[in-house]
């Protein structure tokens, strides 16, 4: 999984405020930088909702982060978006086209909405603003196939994560879209296009070689 990095300096993609913690001394500064408590604390290489925590006090945050740092984990602290608590949108991008989207909701007191954490899923039609942000996020990450997770904030879409190997079960079950077929079609089209380019390149090289051979042959009779 590729987690969202801090893009504020090199793109216009909206994300929750995020700060990295590399040592214990960074904790208070990171919390202040994202707007204070509550905060989301993440292990940067977690998947399917694992390694994501919600903390409400400095004591809780320090205990958690210190323990994670001791295990060599890379940690980030992220703004908590209250209006999106327990829900998000997964936009599935294939070949820079949005092929399906679903809303995920957490169950009970769980704040993580991941399907693999027993969250519920439902199809959702996202507007042009969400669509543009999802496509741009995949493009910036250089991914032809991506699951872009979006929060619905009062200020519009916020990119939470961009996943390079998104699961298909939840999105296909909720939307009834055959996402696997879209992926297969994209891969086959890309393969055909690559073969076409290679064929053209080979033909051009053969023409150049033939022309050079003719020049050599002509010069030999002068």
How would you label these PLM feature ranges?
Residues 39, 100, 146, 158-161:
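Protein kinase-like catalytic core scaffold
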Residues 50-141:
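Phosphate-binding site of ATP-dependent enzymes
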Residues 8-9, 31-50, 73-84:
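ATP-grasp fold ATP-binding core
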Residues 71, 111-159, 181-182, 186-196, ...:
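A long amphipathic alpha-helix within ATP-dependent nucleotide-binding catalytic cores
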Residues 26-30, 60:
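Short acidic active-site motifs
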Residues 1-17, 29:
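Conserved N-proximal alpha/beta basic substrate-recognition cap immediately N-terminal to
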Residues 90-93, 156-170:
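A short beta-strand motif that forms the metal-chelation/ATP-contact edge
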Residues 168-178:
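Short, flexible active-site recognition loops that position polar ligands and cofactors
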């Amino acid at each position: 999984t590729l987690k969202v990095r801090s893009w504020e300096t090199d793109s216009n993609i909206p994300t929750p405020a995020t700060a990295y913690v590399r040592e214990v001394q960074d904790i208070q500064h990171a919390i202040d930088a994202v707007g204070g408590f509550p905060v989301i604390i993440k292990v940067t290489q977690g998947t399917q909702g694992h390694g994501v925590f919600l903390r409400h006090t400095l004591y809780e945050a320090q205990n958690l982060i210190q323990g994670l740092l001791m295990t060599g984990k890379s940690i980030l602290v992220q703004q908590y978006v209250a209006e999106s608590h327990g829900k998000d949108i997964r936009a599935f991008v294939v070949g820079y086209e949005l092929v399906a989207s679903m809303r995920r909701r957490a169950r009970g007191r769980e704040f993580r909405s991941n399907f693999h954490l027993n969250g519920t899923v439902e199809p959702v039609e996202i507007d042009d603003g969400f669509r543009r942000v999802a496509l741009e996020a995949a493009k910036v990450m250089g991914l032809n196939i991506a699951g872009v997770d979006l929060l619905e904030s009062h200020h519009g879409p916020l990119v939470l994560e961009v996943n390079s190997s998104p699961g298909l079960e939840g999105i296909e079950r909720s939307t009834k879209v055959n996402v696997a077929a879209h992926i297969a079609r994209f891969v086959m089209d890309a393969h055909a296009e690559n073969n076409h380019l290679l064929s053209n390149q080979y033909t051009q090289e053969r023409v150049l070689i033939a022309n050079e051979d003719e020049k050599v042959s002509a010069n030999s009779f002068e």
